[in-house]
Amino acid sequence: MNRKIVLLFMFLTTLVIFSKQVSSEEYNVKEVECLVEAIYFESRSEIFDGQIAVGNVILNRVSSDKFPNTICHVVHAGYYYKNGIPIRRRCAFSYWCDGKSERMVNAMAYRTATDAAILVLAGFVVKGLEKSLYYHADYVKPNWVKERKFLRKIGTHVFYK
């Protein structure tokens, strides 16, 4: 096994053991699955900090009065047809309404997204993103960026509050 992977696993395990415990009453299995899925599809090609940052945005939205108050409702927010299918390009998180399958087939990326979700739920926040509520890929320029305060860029994602 690759030494870097073993060291990363040991580091993450140590962080989880010594971090504050996540209340099972606060986040049920479905909520954790929604967070892992969003991190996987929105940022699996990003560095680990970038994946945690995406998770930070999701939890910050859950805590904000401007957004739904559960992880799944935040991740699945958007416009839907009457039959319940999300309208393409009208979702808060693009993967949810891109018309593609939500099957997580890359085992290593799934494990990394799971590790990121665990750390986010344990309270880890990427420095400078404590109040982040928005992000986008750096290859697009949404109209809403004019109304937001830039916080920082991590990998190919740009974060705002």
Predicted regions, residues:
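N-terminal secretory signal peptides that target proteins for export/translocation
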Residues: 1-2
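Sec-dependent N-terminal signal peptides
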Residues: 5-14
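Bacterial extracytoplasmic/cell-wall-associated proteins, especially those involved in peptidoglycan
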Residues: 21-161
